[in-house]
Amino acid sequence: MDTKTLIASEIAKVVPELEQDAIFNLLETPKNSDMGDLAFPAFSLAKVLRKAPQMIASELAEQIDESQFEKVVAVGPYINFFLDKAKISSQVLEQVITAGSDYAQQDEGQGRNVAIDMSSPNIAKPFSIGHLRSTVIGDSLAHIFAKMGYKPVKINHLGDWGKQFGMLIVAYKKWGDEAAVQAHPIDELLKLYVRINAEAETDPTVDEEAREWFRKLEDGDKEATELWQWFRDESLLEFNRLYDQLHVTFDSYNGEAFYNDKMDEVLDLLEAKNLLVESKGAQVVNLEKYGIEHPALIKKSDGATLYITRDLAAALYRKRTYDFAKSVYVVGNEQAAHFKQLKAVLKEMGYDWSDDMTHVAFGLVTKGGAKLSTRKGNVILLEPTVAEAINRAASQIEAKNPNLADKEAVAHAVGVGAIKFYDLKTDRMNGYDFDLEAMVSFEGETGPYVQYAHARIQSILRKADFTPSATTTYSLADAESWEIIKLIQDFPRIIKRTSDNFEPSIMAKFAINLAQSFNKYYAHTRILDDNSERDNRLALCYATATVLKEALRLLGVDAPNEM
């Protein structure tokens, strides 16, 4: 039982007027640790008990069983709880040492599936820093859901269909060079895409020609299909090389094209349920009763189906295939209206499981405050960015530790980890401005800072030649180690909060706090001094490293043992 739950349960025994959950939510952390570890404000009981809060606090403090705590005292309208540091530190250290990386593993999911729609780059377009957000947020959530006892199913819903393929075919037939495309597929296809879009702005026939080629593709024309398949295959080879660098894997690459033959069923179902209404020649579903002003446009007047029709087909397919407990879509915030419509249409169709679908939205990445755009060629490409991050990490490692073994692998872990961590520490609804120098810094709230704290602890443990014993009781009661113990004890709750809020920044901020607390402890404590507390201090180091490494793993970031 964590300390907050323990305190809430002890208060509940003497305050029948309040539920334990309500007490739990009222507990506060005093600004000054001299005032205790947690405090209960008695204001909420004043009306019920018809007494002054100060009097209530004083009376209740007398009634609470103190045997679980160092002391319980009333200070004004608050009951302040001082926890038994030695006892709690002993319990926490034992739990971490016994469980290792399984510490804080939970069983909420009971093995049920969570579908995660993530990454989803567009074929024949470069993998930019904008796609990184969906990729790393989705990957971190997959680790978090697994830690909560779910089985994540990571789906890369590739953008492999649409009018842009008509544009690309036109461009390739005009200016394409097969050898150049094979040598540098995405680079060459991007050049063609930017060039044809520029031409389309002054020549309206380009759009018509592109639409014609896309119609051919939809009709299964041999030349169009072969070109499309080739663009897709070459792009995927390049994407997979990047995913390997990021250490991100997928369970499915079913993209937009996969659902081409599954949309008629959606139209039939909507028809059968009398949900389709004609509007200006198009077929729509009215969603006003859900507070959604604009109807969902299912089929255009020319008979073409739309993005939402495809997503309806995908949602049905995923429910049937994975029978998910949750289905999350890690997609930019600009798609918020689309996902509201998607859920509402499924609800109208009678699918209550649409309540289990969540749009995990996120803000934009900018560069110098400006929005990025593939069409205008204003992008930060991920591959050269990753390469530069690794180089910057390598030069810092060279300066700090020139004799380090396996420098390349460590530089890769630090460079890639720096980019991921910087993205994930930002509240996902906020965007951030891309700054590689800040990302790869070993100082401040960065991935390398947390990794370095972990590596420092491993160095201490190697020097001491220390491995904790599961049968030894370790305990500490000093103020600096107590700050670390409280954080480690809070780790299971941090995992649950991260999962409940689909918010990896909660985990990233926890990792920063733990690294900072350890560095403060390291600065004020002679850890390796040979006295009666040495093994207790080393056990704390071991537990801290275990939790830091696991927190980083849940963010998809490696923790090297040496830097």
UniProtKB/Swiss-Prot annotation:
Top-tier EC class: ligase
SMART domains: Arg_tRNA_synt_N (SM01016), DALR_1 (SM00836)
Entry's Gene Ontology molecular function annotations: arginine-tRNA ligase activity; ATP binding
Motif 'HIGH' region per record, residues: 121-131
Pfam families associated with the record: Arg_tRNA_synt_N, DALR_1, tRNA-synt_1d
EC number: 6.1.1.19
GO cellular component, one term: cytoplasm
GO BP of this protein: arginyl-tRNA aminoacylation
The keyword Aminoacyl-tRNA synthetase appears for this protein: yes
Subcellular location: Cytoplasm
UniProt keyword annotations, A-Z: Aminoacyl-tRNA synthetase, ATP-binding, Cytoplasm, Ligase, Nucleotide-binding, Protein biosynthesis
Principal place of residence: cytoplasm
Superkingdom per UniProt: Bacteria
Catalytic activity: tRNA(Arg) + L-arginine + ATP = L-arginyl-tRNA(Arg) + AMP + diphosphate
UniProt KW Transport keyword: no
HAMAP family: Arg_tRNA_synth
Family statement: Belongs to the class-I aminoacyl-tRNA synthetase family.
PANTHER family, per database record: ARGININE--TRNA LIGASE, CYTOPLASMIC, ARGINYL-TRNA SYNTHETASE
Subunit field text: Monomer.
Protein name: Arginine--tRNA ligase
